[in-house]
């Protein structure tokens, strides 16, 4: 009898924890609704609000990306979107995505990006005189860091992430 009660308590705890994570990611993914118009081919580039929200989600909730990292679908729950545009979202928004290897840590995915995650490559910056000169600081902003050259695997994460966001926005 004690073992049955213990099993029930553990099952309730585990189920409740999973619901909390899903609800958190569901809310996070639905916050990408400003990207829907772009992802359905309604515009040639994502809106500023889409990119801002996408960057915020990538920076604050990369664990939500892992829930869909292995998905190769271009539709969820009957909602279809342009897969090519979804794969291009990090580039179109100049947002660097976390490495997909972070999702393969046995469930121990960080809830924020590591402190040493690079934000881009050097770019020209205005000098005090107003002219442009090379700078040794990362380019882009904290909200919109530049994508690195080897982001093809990261694009898979983003595609999956955006796919779930689109589905959840409709539901």
Swiss-Prot record:
<feature type="disulfide bond">
    <location>
        <begin position="25"/>
        <end position="66"/>
    </location>
</feature>
<comment type="function">
    <text>Probable lipid transfer protein.</text>
</comment>
<feature type="glycosylation site" description="N-linked (GlcNAc...) asparagine">
    <location>
        <position position="72"/>
    </location>
</feature>
<dbReference type="InterPro" id="IPR043325">
    <property type="entry name" value="LTSS"/>
</dbReference>
<protein>
    <recommendedName>
        <fullName>Non-specific lipid transfer protein GPI-anchored 19</fullName>
    </recommendedName>
</protein>
<keyword id="KW-0472">Membrane</keyword>
<dbReference type="Pfam" id="PF14368">
    <property type="entry name" value="LTP_2"/>
</dbReference>
<comment type="similarity">
    <text>Belongs to the plant LTP family.</text>
</comment>
<dbReference type="GO" id="GO:0098552">
    <property type="term" value="C:side of membrane"/>
</dbReference>
<keyword id="KW-1003">Cell membrane</keyword>
<feature type="disulfide bond">
    <location>
        <begin position="64"/>
        <end position="103"/>
    </location>
</feature>
<feature type="propeptide" description="Removed in mature form">
    <location>
        <begin position="148"/>
        <end position="171"/>
    </location>
</feature>
<feature type="disulfide bond">
    <location>
        <begin position="51"/>
        <end position="93"/>
    </location>
</feature>
<feature type="glycosylation site" description="N-linked (GlcNAc...) asparagine">
    <location>
        <position position="148"/>
    </location>
</feature>
<keyword id="KW-0325">Glycoprotein</keyword>
<feature type="glycosylation site" description="N-linked (GlcNAc...) asparagine">
    <location>
        <position position="82"/>
    </location>
</feature>
<keyword id="KW-0732">Signal</keyword>
<feature type="compositionally biased region" description="Low complexity">
    <location>
        <begin position="118"/>
        <end position="141"/>
    </location>
</feature>
<feature type="signal peptide">
    <location>
        <begin position="1"/>
        <end position="18"/>
    </location>
</feature>
<dbReference type="InterPro" id="IPR036312">
    <property type="entry name" value="Bifun_inhib/LTP/seed_sf"/>
</dbReference>
<dbReference type="InterPro" id="IPR016140">
    <property type="entry name" value="Bifunc_inhib/LTP/seed_store"/>
</dbReference>
<feature type="lipid moiety-binding region" description="GPI-anchor amidated serine">
    <location>
        <position position="147"/>
    </location>
</feature>
<feature type="disulfide bond">
    <location>
        <begin position="35"/>
        <end position="50"/>
    </location>
</feature>
<feature type="region of interest" description="Disordered">
    <location>
        <begin position="113"/>
        <end position="149"/>
    </location>
</feature>
<keyword id="KW-0449">Lipoprotein</keyword>
<dbReference type="GO" id="GO:0005886">
    <property type="term" value="C:plasma membrane"/>
</dbReference>
<keyword id="KW-0336">GPI-anchor</keyword>
<keyword id="KW-1015">Disulfide bond</keyword>
């Amino acid at each position: 009898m004690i073992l049955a009660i213990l099993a029930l308590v553990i099952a309730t705890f585990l189920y409740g924890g999973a619901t909390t994570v899903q609800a958190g990611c569901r809310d996070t993914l639905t916050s990408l609704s400003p990207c829907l118009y772009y992802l359905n081919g309604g515009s040639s580039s994502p809106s500023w609000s889409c990119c801002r929200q996408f960057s915020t989600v990538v920076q604050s909730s990369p664990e939500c990306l892992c829930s869909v990292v292995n998905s190769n679908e271009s539709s969820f729950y009957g909602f279809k979107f342009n897969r090519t545009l979804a794969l291009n979202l990090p580039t179109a928004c100049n947002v660097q995505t976390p490495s997909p290897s972070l999702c393969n840590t046995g469930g121990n995915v960080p809830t924020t990006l590591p402190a040493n995650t690079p934000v881009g490559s050097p770019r020209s910056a205005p000098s005090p005189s107003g002219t442009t000169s090379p700078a040794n600081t990362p380019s882009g902003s904290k909200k919109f860091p530049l994508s690195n050259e080897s982001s093809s695997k990261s694009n898979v994460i983003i595609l999956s992430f955006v796919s779930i966001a689109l589905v959840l926005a409709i539901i």
